[in-house]
Structure formats: C-alpha cells, structure tokens
Amino acid sequence: MRELVEAVLGPACFAVRGIFFNKTRSSNWKVAWHQDLTISVRERVHVDGFGPWTTKGGILHVQPSIEVMSGILAIRLHLDESGLDNGPLRVIGGSHRKGRFSAEQISNWGKDKAVVCTVPKGGALIMRPLLLHASSACTVIRSRRVIHLEFAATELPQGLDWHDTV
C-alpha cells in the first residue's frame, strides 16, 4: 500500500487517520453528498484559515486550509465486496479539483454524473477527501466493512499537530 501512496504523495508520506466502517442490516445508514472537510489534531491552536473546530468521539477536529485538504489521500480497503446492493460509495469524478463547496453548491452538482464504486472483497479504492461522495443504505443482509486510511506528506503549520501519525 505504501507504494500506492508514495506514487501520489511522495516518499515523505505518513498515515494521519484510520476509520472502520461496518454497514450491516442492523447498523445501516445513508450518507448524503458531501466532502470530507476535517482533520483530527492533538490540541487547539489558532491558525489563520483553520476552523470551525469540533470534537468527534473525544477527538478534536478542525477544517484546515484547502491546501492541507488537497494534500490528503484516502485509501479504502474493502474487507467485503461492495456491490450495488450494500451501500457502495458514489462519487463525482474530478470534483475534488474544484475546492470546497457550500451545501447549496453540492445540491446543484449534476448527480447524473455520479459513478458507483463497486469494489471486490480485498480491493481498494483511492480518493481525495475533497471528492464529492455519498452512499446509500445497504439493502441486503451481508456486511460492507471498509478500513478507511488517510495519508498526508506535510506537517501542519504553526504548532498544530496531527492527532496521530504513523
């Protein structure tokens, strides 16, 4: 996996976040069109262009500058098949190159251009967090487990630190 990340971010890359998603029949959700806009950090430090601040699961998060978000790469490792019936990711290709969108701008995007990302068990999907994406609820009994890892290649500015780095 490191080779994949280095090919995009260079040899100085490191992991900054990991999330486990487990869509099942009993733990099922739909996610509206959005961009991933926050990073997790160790402590609150005022940096121009960073904010608003939130806490999720006891971890401090902030919306960083567009430059920081543009430098992050996500790899989604699929532990189960992600088929049409178990809530696959849908994306709008190229949208990550256009910056950060307001809710109104997102609602005006041509969803007819969406691509459904079916991924086989053991496969990976690579994306930028700023890519417009959504997912539907699972309509079958089987799970859709995904390990979502985010990578960066630069430290944060002015004394702000990533919450975790590997």
Predicted regions and their residues:
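Non-heme Fe(II) oxygenase catalytic core, chiefly the N-lobe of the double-stranded beta-helix
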Residues: 1-121, 134-142, 149-161
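Glycine- and charge-enriched low-complexity intrinsically disordered segments
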Residues: 164-166
